[in-house]
């Protein structure tokens, strides 16, 4: 066993003394059992994580029952909804790397035989997956699950995106103070990840198709008995996989990454999944081209439109058959998935999901009647984004295939929000927000406040927004993010000026500023070099090492320093 490194031999008697002092080992014979880490992310201020202590206790009991010894440790977590719209958002994406580094440190320092990961919200799930790829120790994931959708006084389903859009609607005067406060109290009624197809739930669904989690991981409610039983079954399966030496890199192959993007397309997942899945591929040693994502989009139908793109919540998806029903439907179209891959169950993707039929065709459409013949995400290229940009086409009004408008440029999120709120931004504008990428932000802040204000003011069809920052999974509208290279790295988005004509072509997947190359070249000559906004602490180190979004926004040590 891997853990023999810390518990076998006379020279490790001091380590054994310390292990006995933990109280986890009940007798000397326990030293012969596998040591299993429980990588938890319990934290009081994140509603998606407040119940994870209880789930970890269930996992511990099941791991002991299966004949192994559990040891729990915790990671940090940032709630993107609470950190939104202020300097706290700079820390959200960078927290992914801290989580990966922290988990790697504990797992490798103590030579665990396996790891039970309990994530739930936005950056915690991908951070833990990065750690799993890096350490390549037998592992299983079981997230905390989604919360129930709220209910407005008018009987309308509410999610967190409803609340962000309500801010714009309230400023516009289209809803009353009483209605606004009622929504605030009822939008998030239980613990769990936010109820729509936002980043957390997108990633937790993708773990099913990647093969790292059990079926229904992405949709079973946080407060359900099914979630607690899933934790137990995952613990038993992990101990079995330790004995069989089934490792994460055996499961997460190039084909698994393809299938993750295919499910993302079918469910209209968050644009952040592109960022995180590229980072996962990078950590797994898989060279993955953005162009590949468009090829997947073209062959994958859009089957389930979930909040914020509709009124359906994750619980509705679960009741309609969950991710297994979507995977089963996609498997009926040859070439869409790679169903004979091994998964954490020890069975193939096909064996896990075959025969799981759709129970509600309003929530999950069939191949015969998709929302769209092509997937809900697109990668755009052009002279603004030579290395790519991302748009959630599933969140764009279906009548819009192209949008051409005049640029109105802002060098920060806050400047843009102020201009939208004071009505400087009008119909026909393309809002350009730059210097908000991984290096420029720093931390690639989410642009949910400006996009929600645009939609809340009733301009969702009439104003577009492009940025080198990113979006919340709750974003909808004509919103293009992840523009690469970013402005801070000298990307062409830095060259756009007010009044430039910009065209977003969703059919041909292009993003262009309609200016001659010689004009852009002259502008580049006078471009002021970017200066880091943060000079000390973690964000200073992050700024120095982070890459643009097209590589997943990962931190890389320059080759000359290795």
UniProtKB/Swiss-Prot annotation:
Co-factor requirement: [2Fe-2S] cluster; Mg(2+)
Binding site for Mg(2+): 80, 122-123, 446
Cofactor note: Binds 1 [2Fe-2S] cluster per subunit. This cluster acts as a Lewis acid cofactor.
Gene Ontology terms: biological process: isoleucine biosynthetic process; L-valine biosynthetic process
N6-carboxylysine: modified positions: 123
GO cellular component: cytosol
Gene3D superfamilies: IlvD/EDD C-terminal domain-like (3.50.30.80)
UniProt cross-references to InterPro entries, sorted A to Z: Dihydro-acid_dehy_C, DihydroxyA_deHydtase, DiOHA_6PGluconate_deHydtase_CS, ILV_EDD_C, ILV_EDD_N, IlvD/EDD_N
GO molecular function, one term: 2 iron, 2 sulfur cluster binding
PROSITE patterns membership: ILVD_EDD_1, ILVD_EDD_2
Keyword Magnesium appears in the UniProt entry: yes
Residues reported in the UniProt entry to bind [2Fe-2S] cluster: 121, 194
Entry EC no(s): 4.2.1.9
Pathway: Amino-acid biosynthesis; L-isoleucine biosynthesis; L-isoleucine from 2-oxobutanoate: step 3/4; Amino-acid biosynthesis; L-valine biosynthesis; L-valine from pyruvate: step 3/4
HAMAP family: IlvD
Entries under PANTHER family matching the protein: D-XYLONATE DEHYDRATASE, D-XYLONATE DEHYDRATASE YAGF-RELATED
Subunit annotation: Homodimer.
Protein name: Dihydroxy-acid dehydratase
Organism expressing this protein natively: Staphylococcus aureus (strain MRSA252)
Gene: ilvD
């Amino acid at each position: 066993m891997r853990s023999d490194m810390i518990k076998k031999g006379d020279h490790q008697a001091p380590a054994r003394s310390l292990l006995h002092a933990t109280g986890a080992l009940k007798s000397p014979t326990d030293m012969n059992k596998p040591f299993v880490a429980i990588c938890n992310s319990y934290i009081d201020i994140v509603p998606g994580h407040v119940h994870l202590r209880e789930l970890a206790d269930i996992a511990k009991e099941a791991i002991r029952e299966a004949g192994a010894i559990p040891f729990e440790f915790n990671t940090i977590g940032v709630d993107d909804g609470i950190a939104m719209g202020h300097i706290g958002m700079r820390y959200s994406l960078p927290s992914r790397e801290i989580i990966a580094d922290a988990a790697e440190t504990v797992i490798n320092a103590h030579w665990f035989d396996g790891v039970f990961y309990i994530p739930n919200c936005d950056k915690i799930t991908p951070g833990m997956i990065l750690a799993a790829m890096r350490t390549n120790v037998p592992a299983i994931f079981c997230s905390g699950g989604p919360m129930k959708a709220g209910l407005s006084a008018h009987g309308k389903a509410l999610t967190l995106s409803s609340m962000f859009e309500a801010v714009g609607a309230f400023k516009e005067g289209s809803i009353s103070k009483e209605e606004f406060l009622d929504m605030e109290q009822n939008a998030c009624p239980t613990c769990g990840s936010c109820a729509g197809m936002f980043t957390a739930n997108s990633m937790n669904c993708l773990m099913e198709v990647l093969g790292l989690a059990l079926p229904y991981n992405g949709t079973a409610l946080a407060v359900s008995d099914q979630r607690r039983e899933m934790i137990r079954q995952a613990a038993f399966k992990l101990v079995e996989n330790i004995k069989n030496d089934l490792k994460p890199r055996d499961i997460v192959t190039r084909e698994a990454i393809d299938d993750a993007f295919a499910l993302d397309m079918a469910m209209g997942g968050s644009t952040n999944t592109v960022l995180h899945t590229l980072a996962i591929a990078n950590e797994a040693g898989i060279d993955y081209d953005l162009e590949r994502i468009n090829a997947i989009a073209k062959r994958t139908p859009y089957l389930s439109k979930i909040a914020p793109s509709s009124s359906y919540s994750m619980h509705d998806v679960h009741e309609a058959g969950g991710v297994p029903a979507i995977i089963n439907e996609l498997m009926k179209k040859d070439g869409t998935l790679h169903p004979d891959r091994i998964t954490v169950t020890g069975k193939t993707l096909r064996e896990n999901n075959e025969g799981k039929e759709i129970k509600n065709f309003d929530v999950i459409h069939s191949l015969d009647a998709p929302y769209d013949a092509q997937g809900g995400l697109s990668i755009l290229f052009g002279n603004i984004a030579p290395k790519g940009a991302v748009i959630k086409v599933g969140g764009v009004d279906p009548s819009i295939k192209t949008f051409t408008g005049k640029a109105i440029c802002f060098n920060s999120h806050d400047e843009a929000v102020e201009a939208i709120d004071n009505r400087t931004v009008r119909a026909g504008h393309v809002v350009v927000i730059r210097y908000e990428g991984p290096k420029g932000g720093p931390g690639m802040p989410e642009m949910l406040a400006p996009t929600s204000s645009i939609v809340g003011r009733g301009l969702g069809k009439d104003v577009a927004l492009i940025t080198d920052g990113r979006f919340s999974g709750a974003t909808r509208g004509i919103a293009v993010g992840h523009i690469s290279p970013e402005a801070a790295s000298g990307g062409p988005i830095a060259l756009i000026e007010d009044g430039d004509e910009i065209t977003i072509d969703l059919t041909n997947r292009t993003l262009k500023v309609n200016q001659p190359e010689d004009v852009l070249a002259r502008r580049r000559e006078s471009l002021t070099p970017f200066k880091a906004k943060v000079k000390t602490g973690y964000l200073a180190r992050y700024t120095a090492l982070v890459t643009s979004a097209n590589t997943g926004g990962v931190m890389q040590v320059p080759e000359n320093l290795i």
